[in-house]
């Protein structure tokens, strides 16, 4: 049977619907957030857009049908995500971050935990956010360090039938919630024993953001993703029931890998969307601007070559994303190599593609009046976040290559 990249009628309808939503709703985000100089206020200003996204069914798409969601495949979610990110990166990132906060529950929660916490989000999908509290103030790349004195320094100790959590996190996307006090649910990556390595002590404990001791202490004002909130959060003697742990101590490494594998593949879709936006701007400029010459600049060979390079990067990123997402769907995420490759490759392609679009347009692209300057600010984030390409993602691939019996053709052949 031939390999077929055609979309089904249902997928075409999903893609068209997401494109229409992006053009009709998300295209207004930039002008709205421009009115707010403070980082957190820009985020709060996107709440109506997120509510419309929830009404359109995108929050339900994060969850399996068995727990009230629509059960959308990762491939289908990627199709929609690409379209959304052509128009705006901010509100789709808030959606993706709610997914990241809930992925530990989806993958490792008990039946009771899944029904309870997914149900809570879906009771008010436009109002309730989830977050993953992963990154320590000192960094997150060494979260799995075998040295107990290094890595995660947020600790949970068991006192009777409660976990008592103390520590500090930052870059906790969505962590402040819409009220600035805490997301509805925060999946906290912590250790249960300071004397044991992560393989024995790393855990994920679900903390309602309204729990006493959860404190939003500040916001990191990022260069790009201007309305994606990145708060610092302190956990000061936060008490939650012992039953709020997902799995058992020591499962934290697997849980984090499960969650970040999902986002790794989908970041490829976000990067593809941003590259498309940059290409559209450069293409329109090339067709219509003569730069004081006699013909539109697209008639010049070098301009055509640059457009070709950008378009090739878009196509390569899209199809690697599709394959990675398909492989996650059919293997229940047991095969994650392509997802990690997608995150690294697409994010670095995106930076180069946007830069080439800026080079094509010239110095005018470097002003704040040009949308390309904003797209570059957004693109620069992709290689650095969600497991930085150097600190985490390439290390994941290196670890795979070093493993006994590694088969370099396994991911290519869907094994």
Predicted region positions:
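N-terminal glycine-rich flavin-associated loop
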Residues: 92-112, 140-141
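Glycine-rich phosphate/cofactor-binding loops in nucleotide/flavin-utilizing enzymes
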Residues: 3-4, 80, 361-415
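Glycine-rich beta->alpha junctions and the first turn(s) of the following alpha-helix
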Residues: 3-16, 215-315, 411-415
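Glycine-rich phosphate/pyrophosphate-binding beta-alpha loops
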Residues: 140, 170-177, 225, 262-267, ...
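A short, Trp-centered hydrophobic/proline-enriched beta-strand micro-motif
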Residues: 126-139
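Amphipathic, small/basic residue-rich leader segments at the start of a protein or domain
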Residues: 1-93, 116, 120, 402-415
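A short core secondary-structure module
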Residues: 161-162, 166-214
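C-terminal helix-coil-helix/basic helical segment that borders enzyme active sites and/or dimer interfaces
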Residues: 30-40, 283-295, 311-345, 358-366
């Amino acid at each position: 049977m031939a390999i077929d990249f055609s979309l089904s009628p249902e997928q075409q309808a999903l893609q068209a619907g997401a494109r229409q939503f992006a053009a009709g709703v998300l295209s207004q985000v930039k002008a709205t957030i421009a009115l707010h100089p403070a980082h957190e206020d820009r985020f709060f200003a996107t709440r109506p857009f997120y509510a419309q996204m929830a009404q359109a069914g995108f929050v339900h798409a994060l969850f399996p049908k068995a727990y009230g969601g629509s059960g959308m495949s990762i491939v289908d979610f990627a199709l929609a995500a690409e379209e959304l990110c052509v128009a705006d990166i901010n509100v789709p990132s808030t959606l993706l971050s709610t997914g990241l906060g809930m992925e530990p529950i989806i993958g490792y929660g008990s039946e009771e935990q899944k029904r309870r916490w997914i149900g809570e989000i879906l009771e008010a999908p436009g109002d309730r956010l989830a977050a993953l509290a992963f990154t320590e103030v000192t960094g997150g790349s060494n979260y799995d360090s075998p040295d107990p004195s290094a890595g995660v320094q947020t600790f949970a100790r068991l006192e009777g039938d409660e976990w008592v959590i103390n520590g500090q996190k930052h870059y906790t996307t969505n962590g402040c919630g819409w009220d600035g006090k805490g997301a509805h649910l925060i999946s906290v990556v912590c250790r249960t024993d300071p004397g044991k390595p992560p393989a024995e002590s790393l855990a994920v404990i679900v903390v309602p953001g309204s729990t006493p001791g959860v404190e939003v202490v500040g916001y990191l004002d990022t260069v790009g993703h201007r309305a994606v909130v990145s708060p610092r959060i302190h956990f000061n003697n936060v008490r939650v029931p012992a039953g709020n742990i997902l799995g058992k101590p020591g499962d934290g490494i697997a849980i984090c890998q499960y969650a970040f594998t999902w986002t790794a593949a989908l970041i490829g879709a976000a990067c593809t969307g941003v590259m498309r936006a940059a290409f559209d701007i450069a293409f329109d400029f090339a067709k219509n601007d003569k730069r004081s010459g006699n013909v539109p600049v697209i008639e010049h060979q070098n301009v055509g070559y640059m457009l070709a390079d950008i378009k090739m990067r878009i196509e390569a990123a899209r199809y690697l994303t599709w394959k990675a997402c398909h492989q996650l769907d059919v293997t229940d995420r047991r095969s994650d190599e392509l997802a990690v490759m997608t995150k690294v490759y697409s994010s670095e392609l995106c930076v180069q593609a946007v830069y080439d679009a800026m080079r094509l347009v010239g110095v005018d692209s470097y002003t704040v009046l040009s949308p390309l300057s904003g797209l570059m600010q957004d693109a620069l984030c992709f290689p650095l976040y969600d497991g930085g390409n150097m600190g985490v993602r390439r290390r994941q691939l290196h670890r795979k290559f070093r493993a006994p019996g590694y088969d370099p053709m396994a991911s290519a052949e869907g094994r």
